Each structure stands twice: as C-alpha cells, then as structure tokens.
C-alpha cells in the first residue's frame, strides 16, 4: 500500500489523474480497490436496509456501480438511478448481481423522493474529479438531487455517502456554484485527499472523510492543501 500521502494532504486533481495513469496502463484494478473501500464504509455506516445509488457516466459512477454489486451480493436491496444518458461499463457487474438500474427520466420527483425515504443509505456517485468544467449538476442529475434534498435534510433521512467528492463541489477549490448538492455524512475519497474537501463550502458538505489507499505514487507532486489539525 502506498504511503505517499495522507488524509491531511490535498493534491490537485491533475496530479491525482497523472498518478493514476501508469497504474491504469499496467492493468491495475484501481476501480475494484476503490469500490471495495466504498462498500466497506457503506456497510459500516448503514449495516442493514435498502441502498439507493446515484451514478453518472464516468469513473465515479463506475466505482459506485461496483460497490452496488458488492452490497447486493451481501443480500442488500440495492437500486441504482442512472442520471446521465450514458453509463459506465461496470453497470454489467451491478446487473449481474441483480441490481435494477433505472434511468432518471423514467422517475418523477415523487418517485425519486419515495426511493430515498425507503432507503437506509444513499450513495452519491454522480460526478468525480474527472469533471473539468463547472462542477454544478445539470439536467436529470440536478433534478434528481433536488428531489432528494428535502428527504435527506428531513428528520430520519438516509445516511449519505459520497464517492470521492460530493457531486457539485469543486475538486480543487471546494466551491459550490449551485447549492443543489447532497451534503454527505461521509465522503470516501481515493488515493489522496482532495483540496475541495478541505476548502470553502466543500469542507462542510463532505462530512467525515475516509481515505482509501489505491497505491498512488504522489511523491513527485506537491500538496496544495492540508486539513486542519
């Protein structure tokens, strides 16, 4: 396991992507390791009850889909809402594990809210650090999160676990250009801390941050943020 960074160190998204590249080229199972760590935290935060997983089109959604498959194999009732027009290839693993995947456009706001009310846990796997434009949610992703927010913020709402970074939070600056963001109870981040979890509004929205070591070598990179000690 890599010891090149700790949760106290926040590295720029570009540096993290550069550190991932050689591992991906060598066929390293980064996503598998990340998903196992995400599933482990989900089990700890909500040991029983249904799980609702929100996924986008990128690798963040892939991590969440593999974690959904792991939880379904535990015997959990897991459902996925696809918030983008495309879905990561890991959807096949989730489907093999018996996880139903529903396109967001097939659910109205009341149905989205009902799924959240029936869930013990919501996993936010919509956007990750690969987002290069504004992190603000758009389209169906924004609509789904807006429908969930009253349930999440209400009494007795489900636990929210964010995958790598809460969707809608800027990875490097922690800024939130649109308040339509699910505030996480726990953020499971991969490889190294993200500055956006330590700065600006993103710090409060991240909740407790758990680091999953995926073996990144960041020895040549300089941290750009440090968590408060």
UniProtKB/Swiss-Prot annotation:
Keyword NADP tagged: yes
Binding residue positions for K(+): 60, 124, 167
Keyword Kinase appears in the UniProt entry: no
Domain YjeF N-terminal: 11-222
Catalysis: reaction(s): (6R)-NADHX = (6S)-NADHX; (6R)-NADPHX = (6S)-NADPHX
Free-text comment on the cofactor: Binds 1 potassium ion per subunit.
Positions with a binding annotation for (6S)-NADPHX: 59-63, 128-136, 164
Keywords: Isomerase, Metal-binding, NAD, NADP, Nucleotide-binding, Potassium
Pfam families: YjeF_N
EC number: 5.1.99.6
GO MF terms, alphabetically ordered: metal ion binding; NAD(P)HX epimerase activity; nucleotide binding
Cofactor: K(+)
InterPro entries per UniProt: YjeF_N_dom, YjeF_N_dom_sf
Assigned protein family: Belongs to the NnrE/AIBP family.
Main function: Catalyzes the epimerization of the S- and R-forms of NAD(P)HX, a damaged form of NAD(P)H that is a result of enzymatic or heat-dependent hydration. This is a prerequisite for the S-specific NAD(P)H-hydrate dehydratase to allow the repair of both epimers of NAD(P)HX.
NCBIfam families given in the database record: yjeF_nterm
UniProt-recorded name of the protein: NAD(P)H-hydrate epimerase
Provenance organism: Clavibacter sepedonicus
């Amino acid at each position: 396991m890599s010891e090149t960074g700790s949760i106290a160190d926040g590295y720029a998204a570009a540096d993290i992507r550069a550190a991932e590249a050689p591992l991906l080229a060598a066929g390293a199972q980064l996503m598998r390791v990340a998903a196992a760590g995400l599933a482990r935290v989900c089990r700890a935060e909500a040991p029983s009850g249904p799980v609702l997983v929100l996924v986008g089109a990128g690798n963040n959604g892939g991590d969440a889909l593999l974690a959904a498959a792991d939880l379904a194999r535990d015997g959990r009732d897991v459902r996925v809402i696809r918030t983008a027009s495309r879905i990561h290839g890991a959807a096949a693993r989730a489907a093999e594990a018996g996880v139903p995947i529903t396109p967001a456009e097939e659910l109205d706001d009341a149905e989205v809210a009902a799924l959240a009310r029936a869930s013990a846990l919501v996993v936010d796997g919509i956007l990750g650090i690969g987002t290069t434009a504004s992190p603000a949610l758009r389209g169906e992703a924004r609509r789904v999160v807006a429908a969930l927010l009253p349930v999440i913020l209400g009494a007795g709402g489900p636990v929210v676990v964010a995958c790598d970074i809460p969707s809608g939070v800027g990875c490097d600056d922690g800024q939130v250009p649109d308040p339509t963001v699910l505030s996480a109870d726990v953020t499971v981040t991969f490889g190294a801390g993200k500055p956006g979890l330590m700065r600006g509004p993103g710090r409060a929205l991240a909740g407790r941050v758990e680091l999953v070591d995926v073996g990144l070598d960041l020895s040549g990179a300089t941290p750009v943020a440090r968590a408060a000690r």
